[in-house]
Amino acid sequence: MTGASILEGCSKNGGSTPATVSVNFTLDLNASSNSALKTVGGYVESNNAIVIRTTTNTYIALSNVCTHQGCTVSYSSQAKDIYCPCHGGTYDLNGNVTGGPPPSALQVFKTSLNGNILTVTS
């Protein structure tokens, strides 16, 4: 393994930026496992994504993998932000870094609603 291969993916602060993730899944909003999405501010975690209902008609989906060192991030409905427990990184609901060591934004996925089926794709 070459030195370049070892350093590939490392950021200037010693973290690593996870590779872009490809997702393509659906959530049935009538399923009990997705009942949190019936309420504005509700969220579910599925398929390496956090899916949040932000308004009556709007859902967002972001990667749940921190861009610093790959830890799993969590959504705080009270703070309305996304938090990494490993080193305190924070992101807004657009995936942008708002604090801490993450070197880049979270990957944002597309959402589309057809009846009670929410589709999430990269």
At which residue positions do the language-model features occur?
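N-terminal pre-ligand scaffold of iron-sulfur
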Residues: 12-78, 105-122
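Elongated alpha-helical scaffolds that mediate protein-protein interactions in large eukaryotic proteins
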Residues: 1-2
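C-terminal motif of bacterial Sec signal peptides marking the signal peptidase cleavage site
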Residues: 5-9
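Short cysteine/histidine-rich metal-coordination sites, predominantly Zn2+-binding motifs
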Residues: 80-88, 98-106
